[in-house]
Amino acid sequence: MSRSRGSVAGGIALAAAALLAAAVPTSVSAAPAPVPSAALPASSADTYYASAEGKTGTALKAALNDIISEQTRLSYSQVWDALGDTDEDPYDPDNVILLYSGRSQSKSEHGGNLGDWNREHVWAKSHGDFGTRTGPGTDLHHLRPTDVRVNSIRGNKDFDNGGSAVSGAPGNYTDGDSFEPRDAVKGDVARMILYMAVRYEGEDGFADLEPNDRVGNGSAPYHGRIGVLKQWHREDPPDSFERNRNEVIYNEYQRNRNPFIDRPEWVEAIW
């Protein structure tokens, strides 16, 4: 009788072990999903944005400009290491996630060679002709790691829907004067463009950057298309990867924030 109870107990133990093994993943997906991150606590957000509360339109835009203009500025060479932190793959700390392709790639594989990643200015640096100078040219809130070839294809094009598929970067499309990023980062792109329009208002010796509703802006300090960007912002709200990025920039590098990640409703309040 005791031997029978032991056999039953052993069978239960083996079954439990099998269930436990089945519940533990043996590998990680090659395309990492966003992981939870600590957003700015409500009390801290209230303090940071206190002077902007209750405002709309140009008054809100001006108040946010005053707030986010208080920042630490990086050199262009410092951006390499910073992007390794801001865009770190949450499942592999040795890698970054490339903006347009979504590929996870070694932090050390950056430069100008085919297959490397480089520093993409989401607000194209020729739109306002600020180049890579400290300021808009080195602002982490719109700099992202991207594949060298895909970055070249995007060039300084405005953002819009449509075009032909970009080889090697599924979900991205381009034509002669515009670029459409993959769905998972459309809102990210929109919020980066709108951050730049609030942060750089013709002060500090740089152009007044503004969104408009056209493509082919060239070297003018405008970026399109605002109607499409607002649609992308609505359809792709901030996820945990984007919120974590905002935290890293604020806490470890620039000490300023992208308000449209923290308060998405402010896009409609201004535009």
Describe the residue ranges of each PLM region.
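Short, His- and charge-rich active-site/binding loops that engage polyanionic ligands
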Residues: 96-98, 102-116
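Secretory targeting and sorting signals
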Residues: 1-32
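Domain-level detector of nuclease and nuclease-like folds
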Residues: 112-271
